[in-house]
């Protein structure tokens, strides 16, 4: 049995939602969590910067002797995962594949599925979510919306006030009549 910890990386504290779910599913596993709050947010950075920051996070986790790395950040997954996963001997996974695989099962027989995605502008611009959905659910109609204010608001703890509600309401105007809404960033 491999007793090494699982490494988990995010651009901030949003990945703690992934951490909590992994701990619930795998209660006997140890997890090393790295939240890069110093250089947050990633959503407005260039792809090259995100790849470099992701490599630095992975390098830190490798030094912690982890057996697996979970990129618990939608932006880093969509912009850097494909670039970094073959650079290391430790398996590296992100949040996009498992989410879309779940939706593939759900919408396998639905030719009219409408899927909405909200995430950072960089995540939406990368088309990571959209490409995976089109690969696994080709008939799906996709509505994607960059929401640059949500991650900073979540980091500040502004999640249950009038400003948050009005901001979310504005972002969701285009998401009417969807079957599923993907929160494409972990915040």
What are these regions (language model features)?
Residues 1-186:
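Non-catalytic structural scaffold of enzyme domains
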């Amino acid at each position: 049995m491999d007793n090494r910890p699982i490494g988990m990386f995010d651009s901030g504290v949003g990945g703690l939602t992934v951490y909590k779910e992994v701990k619930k599913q795998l209660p006997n596993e140890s997890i090393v969590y790295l939240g890069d709050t110093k250089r947050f947010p990633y959503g407005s950075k260039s792809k090259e910067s995100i790849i470099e920051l992701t490599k630095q996070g992975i390098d830190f986790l490798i030094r912690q002797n982890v057996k697996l790395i979970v990129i618990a950040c939608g932006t880093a997954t969509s912009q850097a995962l494909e670039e970094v996963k073959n650079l290391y001997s430790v398996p590296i996974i992100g949040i996009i594949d498992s989410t879309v695989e779940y939706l593939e099962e759900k919408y396998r027989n639905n030719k009219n599925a409408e899927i909405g995605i909200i995430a950072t502008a960089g995540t939406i611009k990368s088309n990571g979510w959209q490409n995976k959905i089109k690969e696994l659910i080709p008939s799906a109609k996709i509505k994607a919306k960059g929401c640059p204010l949500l991650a900073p608001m979540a980091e500040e703890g502004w999640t249950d006030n009038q400003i948050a509600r009005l901001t979310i309401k504005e972002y969701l105007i285009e998401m009417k009549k969807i079957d599923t809404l993907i929160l494409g960033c972990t915040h």
